[in-house]
Amino acid sequence: MSRIAKAAGVALGTGAVVLSGTGMAMADAGAAGAAVGSPGVLSGNVVQVPVHVPVNLCGNTIDVIGLLNPAFGNACENGDDDDKSGGYGG
């Protein structure tokens, strides 16, 4: 087998392995765990902390907490969607 065919096979196999592990993670925004039946305050084993990470979607870039912002200088807005027109352009 030639080197190019081996390299293509390895690249295809690696891509298949990487893409097979991707998926969507979904979670609730609030933490509502409970240690039911535990005899004391410190005897439960439930620790939950709600985490809120701001994600900025601007044009065709996505930033998490604005680190190394590729959209520097673009006008973007983070806010509620108050316009309920339901369509594009007005």
From Swiss-Prot:
Q: State what induces this protein.
A: Not expressed while still submerged, accumulates during aerial hyphae formation on minimal medium, no transcript detected during sporulation. Strongly expressed in aerial hyphae (at protein level). During aerial hyphae formation and early sporulation on rich medium, under control of ECF sigma factor BldN. Expression depends on bldB but not bldA, bldD or bldH (at protein level).
Swiss-Prot/TrEMBL keywords: Amyloid, Cell adhesion, Cell wall, Disulfide bond, Secreted, Signal
Q: A single GO CC term, please?
A: extracellular region
Note the biotech application. The small chaplin mixture (a cell wall extract of an rdlA-rdlB knockout) forms a stable coat on a number of surfaces (including Teflon and cotton) and emulsifies oil-water mixtures, which could be useful in medical and technical applications.
This protein's name: Chaplin-G
Q: Which residues form a coiled coil?
A: none
Q: List the signal peptide residues.
A: 1-27
Q: Which residues form the Chaplin domain?
A: 38-78
The answer, when asked if Secreted is one of the entry's keywords, is: yes
Please name every pair of cysteines joined by a disulfide bond in this record: C58-C76
InterPro entries cross-referenced by the UniProt entry: ChpA-H
Q: Which gene encodes it?
A: chpG
Organism equals Streptomyces coelicolor (strain ATCC BAA-471 / A3(2) / M145)
Function description: One of 8 partially redundant surface-active proteins required for efficient formation of aerial mycelium; the short chaplins assemble into a hydrophobic, amyloidal fibrillar surface layer that envelopes and protects aerial hyphae and spores, presumably anchored to the long chaplins. Chaplins have an overlapping function with the surface-active SapB peptide; chaplins are essential on minimal medium while on rich medium both chaplins and SapB are required for efficient aerial hyphae formation. Chaplins are also involved in cell attachment to a hydrophobic surface.
Family per similarity comment: Belongs to the chaplin family. Short chaplin subfamily.
Q: Which GO terms describe its biological process?
A: cell adhesion
